[in-house]
């Protein structure tokens, strides 16, 4: 099983994939005051509620816009997975993960990993020539060209700002 995290400013969305299929998804509030132990307990409780065996987790992928939480989540994964855990914890943007997308913008470092991942997912699901709108803490509009290239985007205040 693969454990995934989308760590945002407001929420952490956790997914469990088995055989490339999403089998469960949860949402926790983002809280930098919690410890890695706290997050480990939260995730264990969520898995137990759904009868998911944490020891069967073989890898994890983290996409994050909150660096402090990224470290906490990495620590928490190590606390509740098996000592024989041989999978890798990949952090998008930190582990030289090739996202295989052409960023057609002046400053590539200004495009958040969340927006790049949204663009890749949109292209995989719908093909090119897309505008992707993400209503998160901020509302983002991102444009994907016909060949899957990222053409740019805009960040606006979110609905609660």
Pin down the residues of each PLM region.
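Gly/Thr-rich phosphate-binding beta-strand-loop-beta motif of the actin/hexokinase/Hsp70
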Residues: 1-25, 122, 128-150
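Short, flexible micro-motifs
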Residues: 11, 115, 139, 151, ...
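Short, well-ordered alpha-helices that flank and scaffold nucleotide-derived cofactor binding pockets
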Residues: 18, 45, 75, 79, ...
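N-terminal phosphate-binding loop and adjacent alpha-helix
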Residues: 23-72, 160
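A general structural signal for short secondary-structure boundary/capping elements
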Residues: 50, 110-113, 135-137
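Short beta-strand-loop/turn "lid" adjacent to the catalytic site in phosphate-handling enzymes
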Residues: 52-110, 147-151, 156-159
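Conserved phosphate-binding catalytic cores of ATP/NTP-utilizing and phosphoryl-transfer enzymes
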Residues: 97-130
């Amino acid at each position: 099983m693969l454990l995934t995290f989308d760590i945002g400013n407001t929420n952490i969305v956790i997914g469990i994939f088995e055989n490339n299929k999403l089998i469960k998804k949860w949402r926790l509030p983002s809280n930098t005051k919690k410890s890695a132990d706290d997050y480990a307990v939260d995730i264990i409780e969520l898995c137990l509620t759904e009868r998911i065996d944490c020891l069967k987790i073989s890898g994890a992928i983290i996409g994050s816009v909150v660096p402090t939480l990224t470290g906490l989540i990495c620590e928490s994964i190590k606390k509740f997975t098996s000592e024989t855990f041989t999978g890798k914890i990949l952090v998008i943007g930190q582990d030289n993960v090739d996202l295989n997308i052409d960023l057609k913008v002046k400053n590539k470092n200004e495009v958040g990993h969340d927006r790049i991942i949204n663009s890749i997912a949109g292209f995989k699901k719908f093909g090119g020539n897309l505008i992707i709108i993400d209503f998160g803490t901020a509302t983002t509009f991102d444009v994907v060209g016909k060949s899957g290239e990222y053409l740019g985007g805009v960040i606006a205040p979110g609905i609660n700002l």
